[in-house]
A protein has these predicted regions:
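Short amphipathic alpha-helix used as the core "switch/output" element in two-component signaling
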Residues: 39-42, 63-76, 91-96
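C-terminal output helix
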Residues: 106-123
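CheY-like receiver
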Residues: 125-145
Length: 145
């Protein structure tokens, strides 16, 4: 059984996602912000196959959360959710680090069918740490002047 960590600062979204994913046969862990998600991931000793996270959240946004979590758990795949119709620099102005082209995103609101289809699609992709085309993001201190 695959484990999915669902993170959204809206409890109703977490509950909806949890109910849909449990019904589809997944094990679900829930957090209402990025910091709580990192604590849950640290305490969870088994693999977390997918991080399903909102993009715009207080304190630690979804992109920053994904970066921290995948550094600790490189085989964890990431699916973003967002109710905002903005990407790239516009999103960065709202919430910190921005999505990159090709990052999988599920628009909110979503249906149970759309959620389970997108989760299945992302889980079927090769693990980021095993892909020869892994998009490791350099830290700012590693950038060339």
């Amino acid at each position: 059984m695959e484990t999915i960590l669902v993170v959204d600062d809206e409890p109703d979204i977490c509950e909806l996602a949890r109910d849909c994913l449990v019904a589809a046969g997944y094990r679900v862990l829930e957090a209402t912000d990025g910091e709580e998600a990192l604590r849950i991931a640290e305490a969870h000793t088994e693999p977390i196959h997918l991080l399903l996270t909102d993009v715009v959240m207080p304190r630690l946004n979804g992109v920053a959360l994904a970066g921290q979590l995948t550094r600790r758990r490189p085989d964890t795949k990431v699916l973003y959710m967002s109710g905002f119709a903005v990407v790239g620099a516009q999103l960065e102005q709202l919430s910190g680090p921005a999505l990159e082209p090709g990052d999988p995103i599920l628009p909110k609101p979503f249906t149970a069918e759309a959620l389970t289809r997108k989760v299945h699609e992302v889980l079927a992709r090769p693990s980021p740490s095993r892909s020869p085309f892994s998009r490791a993001r350099p830290r700012p201190d590693q950038w060339m002047p």
